[in-house]
Regions:
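A general structural signal for well-ordered alpha-helical segments in protein cores
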Residues: 36, 63, 101-102, 152
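Active-site-adjacent alpha-helix immediately C-terminal to a catalytic or transition-state-stabilizing loop
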Residues: 60, 128-153
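Generic structural signal for well-ordered alpha-helical scaffold segments
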Residues: 37-44, 124, 128-136
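Phosphate-handling substructures
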Residues: 68-129
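Active-site-proximal alpha-helix that buttresses catalytic centers in soluble enzyme cores
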Residues: 2, 7-76
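Short beta-strand scaffold positions
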Residues: 53-54, 125, 146-147
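Cofactor-binding loop segments of dinucleotide-utilizing enzymes, especially the Rossmann-like FAD-
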Residues: 9, 79, 148
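Short, active-site-adjacent cap segments at secondary-structure transitions
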Residues: 13, 58-60, 83-84, 151-153
């Protein structure tokens, strides 16, 4: 049976609680590294033939332990990258976050039709593409795609 697993990267060290999106330099926390090790344990006895990961560091870090355990390369694929977002680098919370900045309201008035970044339809298209690609290149086997919350959601 052909199986494509989608996995969100582990917990990220983000003490300022900003929306980091595609920003560089956001690495896994100690807990996130532990999560990546647990995935490696889970996958050690699975017939995973290929590992794909977003180019962002946190996804690469999450994929590394299982790739090492399985002796597989990590294939970086931009289709797995986090959604583009104009709020990168800002806090998005109650209080001092984006929600209390009137200049931001034009972007968030309709959460079902985002105007703050990459349209959902484009996310669906690229994630569907990578799923089909992974399945067709690993027929009868399993593959693992390490991505981010919004693209998987």
């Amino acid at each position: 049976m052909t199986v494509v697993h989608f996995l969100r990267h582990g917990e990220v060290f983000n003490p300022e609680k900003i929306l980091y999106g595609r920003m560089p330099g956001f690495k896994l926390s100690a807990r996130g590294l532990e999560m990546a090790e647990r995935i490696a344990q889970w996958g050690s006895d699975r017939p995973i033939a290929q590992i794909y990961a977003s180019p962002l560091e946190r996804a690469q870090q999450t994929a590394t332990p299982i790739a090492q355990k399985k002796n597989l390369p990590i294939t970086t694929d931009v289709r797995l990258i986090e959604a583009a977002n104009i709020f990168e680098g800002k806090t998005f919370e109650v209080g001092s976050g984006v929600l209390f900045r009137p200049q931001s309201w034009k972007y968030i008035w309709n959460p079902w039709r985002p105007s703050w970044g990459e349209p959902y339809s484009e996310l669906v298209d690229r994630m569907t593409e990578i799923a089909k690609f992974a399945a067709s290149n690993n027929v009868g086997k399993e593959s693992l795609c390490v991505s981010h919350q919004l693209p998987i959601w």
